[in-house]
UniProtKB/Swiss-Prot annotation:
Gene3D superfamilies, A to Z: Jelly Rolls
GO MF annotation: an example: iron ion binding
Catalytic activity: homogentisate + O2 = 4-maleylacetoacetate + H(+)
Encoding gene, per UniProt annotation: hmgA
InterPro entries: HgmA_C, HgmA_N, Homogentis_dOase, Homogentis_dOase_bac, RmlC-like_jellyroll, RmlC_Cupin_sf
Protein name per its UniProtKB record: Homogentisate 1,2-dioxygenase
Cofactor(s) the protein needs: Fe cation
Length: 433
């Protein structure tokens, strides 16, 4: 394979833009999408990420101008080695927390290293989300695409170099990458090993949340999202193309690289975002605002304001609220919360929640700061204080998340999670207000 190893990649800035990029001058047709003879003898191909008749503001589609059309492939065969996508575990209302998953000892590439954690929908449904933790120690030689959903990738350890049909992305911990449904890609590991989280979004593509009375600026700013520039591989020789289809891996062997797009234009693109650029908002008077003010991306449902999935972060920020219990409050939620930790510590948990770990609080599961955090917060001097050197996140969804059998049976599941609240005392005194 002819692969670009340059450390300085170029990107296109913006979110939801109608981008255009070409690796050879004049490779993009002018004034039309599908000319009788495309420049350089290329094939025109459309990749649709939404239905043709969606509102124009919600359309996602990209025209590709490639050396060989995607239709040039033999029959897909079901692979003998299948992902750990077993049945979901039994129903449990219990709060769950996991220690970090170990890195593999055997050679494991990106798509072999997915551990299913929770899900609320089968892959053939038009909504829902499945969550995985990935652990890998070998760069991919094959190419992959996911027919089941859009992928939101959250590295916790190790950089990822993602070669996509539209170009190259490199992401490190505290950055994220999003790969559209059906987009072919290959993941290389510049640091030799990697671990992180994946949300597989089966619903509407992720978008920026509405800002409402916040105004026209704040949270994740559109210009900080970066899409790749056109980059193609012109290579002949056997390449395995793997697709995930209804939770199963199927593959065929090509005699060329499928990452052969010389030019493209459209809005259905992979992209990256640096979480450290998030414009964090919070109170400058009293009380702790709702965590929705930390939303980076959202996948909506047909009910206005109800998310199929929100991606929320808890970044470094100043705490200045007066006469206020400053940690996230005790809560019972209509939504379902899967949390992970990229670095540092989470301000509602003094211990037990580690980078690479995870927790699940289902619908109406009572949760909140642990006993140690609560005791310190009640007694704290309420001077301005910065929560620093941290990055936690949450996948929040309106449908109940059920843990997988693998997640329920793995040794990383903490048997004593409930004990972090067990020593919360009763301080009620009816004679003293």
């Amino acid at each position: 394979m002819n692969r670009d190893t340059s450390p300085d990649l170029q990107y296109l800035s913006g979110f939801g833009n109608e981008f255009a990029s070409e690796a050879l001058p004049g490779a993009l047709p002018v004034g039309q999408n599908s000319p009788q003879k495309a420049p350089y003898g290329l094939y025109a191909e459309l990749l649709s990420g939404t239905a043709f008749t969606m509102a124009r503001s919600e359309l996602r589609r990209t025209w590709l101008y490639r050396i060989r059309p995607s239709a040039l492939h033999p029959r897909f065969e079901r692979l003998a080695r299948q992902p750990l996508n077993g049945p979901l575990g039994g129903v449990t209302p219990n709060r769950l927390r996991w220690n970090p998953q170990p890195l593999p000892t055997e050679p494991t590439d990106f798509i072999e290293g997915w551990l299913p954690m929770v899900a609320n929908s089968a892959a053939d449904k038009p909504a829902g989300v499945s969550v995985y933790i990935y652990c890998a120690n070998r760069s991919m030689e094959r190419v992959f695409f996911n027919a089941d959903g859009e992928l939101l990738i959250v590295p916790e350890q190790g950089r990822l170099r993602i070669a996509t049909e539209l170009g190259l992305l490199e992401v490190e911990p505290q950055e994220i990458a999003v790969v559209p449904r059906g987009m072919k890609f290959r993941v290389e590991l510049p640091d030799g090993q990697a671990r992180g989280y994946i949300a597989e979004n089966h619903g509407a593509p992720l978008r920026l949340p509405d800002l409402g009375p916040i105004g026209s600026n704040g949270l994740a700013n559109p210009r900080d999202f970066l899409a790749p520039v056109a980059h193609y591989e012109e290579a002949e020789g056997p390449v395995q193309l793997v697709q995930k289809f209804l939770g199963e891996h199927w593959a065929c062997e090509l005699q060329h690289s499928p990452l052969d797009v010389v030019a493209w234009h459209g809005s259905n693109v992979p992209y990256k975002y640096d979480l450290r650029r998030f414009n964090t908002l919070g109170t400058v008077s009293f009380d702790h605002p709702d965590p929705s003010i930390f939303t980076v991306l959202t996948s909506p449902t047909s009910v206005h304001g109800l998310a199929n999935m929100d991606f929320v972060i808890f970044p470094p920020r100043w705490m200045v609220a007066e006469n206020t219990f400053r940690p996230p409050w005790f809560h019972r939620n209509l939504m379902n919360e899967f949390m992970g930790l990229i670095s540092g510590a989470y301000d509602a948990k003094a211990e037990g929640f580690l980078p690479g770990g995870a927790s699940l609080h289902g619908v109406m599961s009572a949760h909140g700061p642990d006993a140690e955090t609560c005791e310190k917060a009640i007694a704290a001097d309420l001077a301005p204080h910065k929560i620093d050197n941290t990055m936690a996140f949450m996948f929040e969804t309106s449908q109940v998340l059920r843990p997988s059998l693998q997640a329920l049976e793995c040794p990383q599941l903490q048997a004593d999670y409930d004990s972090c609240w067990a020593t919360l005392p009763s301080t009620f005194n009816p004679n003293r207000r």
